[in-house]
Amino acid sequence: TLFAPQFLENKLKFFPYIKEAVCFGDQKDFVSCFINIDIDAVGNWAEKKGVGYSGYVDLSSKLEVAELVKDCISEVNEDLLKEKDLKGSVIKKFLVLPKELDADDDELTRTRKVRRNFINEKYKILIDALYSSVDNCDFETKVTFEDGRTGSLKANVKILNC
């Protein structure tokens, strides 16, 4: 699939619930993406909807949040389908990352640009899951906290169809 990832990512980040998006599709059969939710916007939405959560990891794993993100992606896909040159860029699968992409973890530059090559390596297991028939994937990664300490994050990540 020939596509411009930044174009899709910027369309997705237009939604207040999506803080960051990373799209994949180069030399793949279809386009997929990682989504980072905006904890403040989605947290406020969750409170209004009565969806309880204990933090980012918990909120990002909620089915209601996945549906909210799916609605945003569906709107982007509808726009893409209106342009014949962009029909091949329709997003078919996505996942909500259990952690925020962070410059301290080398996933973003200090100016918040996605470091694609690093993400392709660090999140290979999740990218592979997007292009397989599984509907979830166990994931573990190192994280750096604001005070410089490091830790580990384990999560079962849902793979969702658009």
Language model segments and positions:
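AMP-binding/adenylate-forming catalytic core of the ANL superfamily
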Residues: T1-D85
